[in-house]
Amino acid sequence: MTQPLRIIFAGTPDFSVPPLKTLIDSEHEVVAVYTQPDRPAGRGRKLTASPVKQTALEHDIPVYQPVSLKTPEAQAELEALQADVMIVVAYGLILPKAVLDMPKYGCLNIHASILPRWRGAAPIQRAIQMGDAETGVTIMQMDVGLDTGDMLTILKTPIKPEDTAQTLHDRLSALGCDAMMTTLSNLQTDQLSPVKQDERQVTYAEKLNKAEAELDWQASAQTLARQVQAFNPWPVAFTQYQGQPLRIWQAEVGHASTQKSPGLVISVSKTGMEVATGKGSLLIKQVQPSGKKAMPAYDFAQARQLTGQTLG
């Protein structure tokens, strides 16, 4: 029988919760959870605990929330936990070399891409946006670089035509649990075979910003449809209508072969509103006007008789 591992878990957002719950339910011992400090959230800007902290507290696991892991105090605290390994999932703090070297087996990271493609902050969204056929999760041995460590386990999944960043996020989070448990099992039985990343294949997934969510109707319908799916649920693709932002939650490549001016609403039907683009048409299915709830594009377009009007 292999000995259960003493594990420190470090993570912050929703993506990190399934791996933490998987570890709690496993034979291993989660000795502590590290997460970002509570942040103001919602309309009242009330201090709110991260999803990972909430999960840890529900299971009576000690929670640490240092602002930095670079101070001697924070490092002494972590070292005192005498962990075998630290699992890091979207934690959001830089781990200095001293911390990376503290646990017996170092620090392992669950990254939501097939490395070395899409190192960085937004691998899920960039994979959809660029039309990748597949993506996955990589478990890597962390080093001081950004997602540069040796790869220990890779699990893949196809990107489906209907995938949004949310659906892919949920699937990869679950896949990350499987990859993590496989890696820990291999670590316990000394069967890990680290693979170096090919630096020639590296691409970077830049952090998302709200400005890039605005649709450029000169682009192709294919590009715009991917943008809508990649930016759902945040920052949400949008266009302008009568000087107000109109969020677009759901869209797909339309069937109209059009030479019409990009941004022109060609037709409105029960399936949605079809808009001319730089190449082909985009069928918009769900929109959200400023200050209102999301609604079928058909309802929005019918009420305003949008056929023949221009968006953007």
UniProtKB/Swiss-Prot annotation:
Source organism per UniProt: Hydrogenovibrio crunogenus (strain DSM 25203 / XCL-2) (Thiomicrospira crunogena)
CDD domains linked to this entry: FMT_core_Met-tRNA-FMT_N, Met_tRNA_FMT_C
InterPro entries: Fmt, Formyl_trans_C, Formyl_trans_C_sf, Formyl_transf_N, Formyl_transf_N_sf, Formyl_transferase-like_C_sf, GART_AS, Met-tRNA-FMT_C
Gene (name only): fmt
Matching Pfam families: Formyl_trans_C, Formyl_trans_N
Cysteine-cysteine disulfides: none
Molecular function terms from GO: methionyl-tRNA formyltransferase activity
Lineage per the UniProt record: Bacteria, Pseudomonadati, Pseudomonadota, Gammaproteobacteria, Thiotrichales
A GO CC term assigned to this protein in UniProt: cytosol
Protein name (Swiss-Prot/TrEMBL): Methionyl-tRNA formyltransferase
